[in-house]
Amino acid sequence: MAEVLTGARIFDGARFLDGHALVIEAGEIAAILPEAEAPAKGRRAVPGILAPAFLDLQVNGGGGLMLDGTTDLDGLRRICAAHRALGTAGVLPTLITDTPKATAHVIALGIAAAEAQVPGFLGLHLEGPHLDPRRKGAHDPALIRPMTDEDLARLCDAARRLPALMVTLAPEAASPQQIAALAGAGAVVSLGHSDCSHDEAQAAFAAGARCATHLFNAMSQIGNRAPGLAGAVLAGKPGAGLIADGIHVHPAVMRLALGARPEGIFLVTDCMAFAGTDLTEMELGGRKVLRRDGRLTLADGTLAGADLTLPQAIAVLVRQVGIAPERALRMASAIPAALLGLQDRYGTLAPGRPADLVLLDEDFALREHRLSP
């Protein structure tokens, strides 16, 4: 029997539909129609907001585990499952700067996860090691290094074999030719952890980079005579992830950025093993990460990822930044889906689509979620 969800404001990926019902049959959306025209049987009132389930393209871990050179397939399943429990239909598990051996292990793991059809696994995000140590953030500077021909060959092969691959790199550590080769192999090249100039950033984007990693964090900032990487992102058209916890980027700066870029900026959590748990401490490459008052930091106070969920980020955008709910919801679903070329699968509620959806309350807290296997 069909399930008929009533009483919610339905966000279909573009607009809110009030007074409508969403009908689900066999795991798919069968119809969205005025409540007066909806079937009487199978009705269930779900006050709140029904919206497309989320995508998160930067998750370093979850469920008590980090993605690293020791993660096995069960561990990767656990990471993905932790995020699905938070309403996120798909993630790019993210490996931060590590050894060549660890990188090769994680790539092989990702290929195995794709073959095993791990629920929620969209591909991989390799954040480093080809970064600028001047903008290392919480990455281990001893492991940061320029890209070699061997690195490039490994990454291009991974891009061809994985369903999706995002590679965060700094233009200082990879040439335009290497960036072009990566993009040509199908990787989403994202600029980050970089102190590059505006001109260097533009050259990297011209070569094929089409995204920036955690906008404003660990990158050259906007100056009146030196616009930096942040300026190149805001003046151009690349995608850009944004950690909207109100800590990594001030709400006023987010407001300016979103005013400059009507499209392209999307939400990420940059979360760690803490996601979906009550953990208060963890180890990161032998260094302790502390979870205190909504912050994740190393002992010296350096931010080390975010203690954030996508519903929380949406609430920050709406309540603190002043962004319309429609846009905030798109930033957690349709916009990242489009960056990965998955707009026909995620980000929209429409007849014939899988019933991947979330139910949020009036404060954007997650109440329920429904995700395809």
Model-derived segments and spans:
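Residue-level marker for buried hydrophobic side chains located in beta-strands
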Residues: A53-L55, S190, L267-V268, V358
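Divalent metal-binding pocket/active-site signature
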Residues: L126, P133-G228
